[in-house]
């Protein structure tokens, strides 16, 4: 696997009011890399959902922990990692619990809560991996259409 040409890492308190900072960062990075407007919007929604899930579900105490966000910039893709050290969950068990929504059998007013954010992340990103050994780590990948990387852009790495 190739090495990223730049890596950016941020840590935020696991509080919903900081998710906007991560959205803006994702938008700025994706724009610089050459993603389209629609792709940037997809990235913003996916990273927001992952961070919001961590802020709402990872830590049970009032002294909330933190969420780490890593952006790996490659020539052909952007990988975003959102990780917490809070309560883990089993994705397969959650999917069994919430099950698919069937509009023929269920009214929208009584739709089960939970899982929509995970569905959005998987739908909007090209690749998604969940790890739940220590806390939860979400690895999301969005590929560029062709070579849209800004040529001659100044980066941190040589």
Annotated model-derived regions:
Residues 27, 48, 126-127:
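A general secondary-structure boundary signal
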Residues 1-9, 55-158:
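Conserved beta-strand-loop-beta-strand hairpin that lines the nucleotide-binding pocket
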Residues 1-45, 150-158:
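Bergerat-fold GHKL ATPase/HATPase_c domain
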Residues 37-62:
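Conserved ATP-binding N-box helix of the HATPase_c
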């Amino acid at each position: 696997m190739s090495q990223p040409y730049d890596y950016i890492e941020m840590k935020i308190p696991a509080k919903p009011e900081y998710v906007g900072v991560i959205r803006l960062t994702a938008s700025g990075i994706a724009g610089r890399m050459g993603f389209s407007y629609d792709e940037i919007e997809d990235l913003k929604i996916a990273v927001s959902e992952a961070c919001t899930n961590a802020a709402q579900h990872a830590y049970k105490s009032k002294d909330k922990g933190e969420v780490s966000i890593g952006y790996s910039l490659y020539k052909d893709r952007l990988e975003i990692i959102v990780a917490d050290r809070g309560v883990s969950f089993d994705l397969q068990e959650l999917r069994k619990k919430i099950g698919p929504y069937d509009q023929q059998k269920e009214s929208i007013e009584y739709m089960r809560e939970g899982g929509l954010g995970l569905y959005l992340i998987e739908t909007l990103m090209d690749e998604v991996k969940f790890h739940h050994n220590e806390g939860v780590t979400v690895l999301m990948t969005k590929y560029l259409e062709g070579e849209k990387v800004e040529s001659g852009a100044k980066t941190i790495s040589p």
